[in-house]
A protein has these predicted regions:
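Short, polar/acidic, helix-capping and beta-turn segments at strand->helix junctions
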Residues: 1-80
Length: 80
């Protein structure tokens, strides 16, 4: 859960740098490695998105490029 929280903080930092906000998120594709508590994951994502509902895809992977990393989120955002 800590890596998921950190991933969202990185997303928000990049959104701010581009003068964007959560409402500008269009699509999230999340890759997870290992066992995850579904209820905790859903609660964290819901709290981070604060009611915004972009298109989302969740995939479980055997591994990511760095074995220490257990979560990766590919984000699309758009604004005028």
């Amino acid at each position: 859960i800590e890596q998921l929280d950190l991933a969202f903080e990185n997303i928000f930092r990049n959104l701010r740098a581009a003068n964007m906000q959560v409402a500008d998120l269009v699509k999230l594709t999340t890759y997870l490695v290992g066992e995850w508590d579904t209820d905790k994951r859903r609660a964290l994502v819901a709290s981070k998105l604060a009611g915004h509902q972009p298109a989302m895809t969740l995939m479980y992977a055997a591994a990511l490029a760095n074995p220490a990393i257990k979560v990766e989120i590919d984000v699309w955002a758009s604004c005028e």
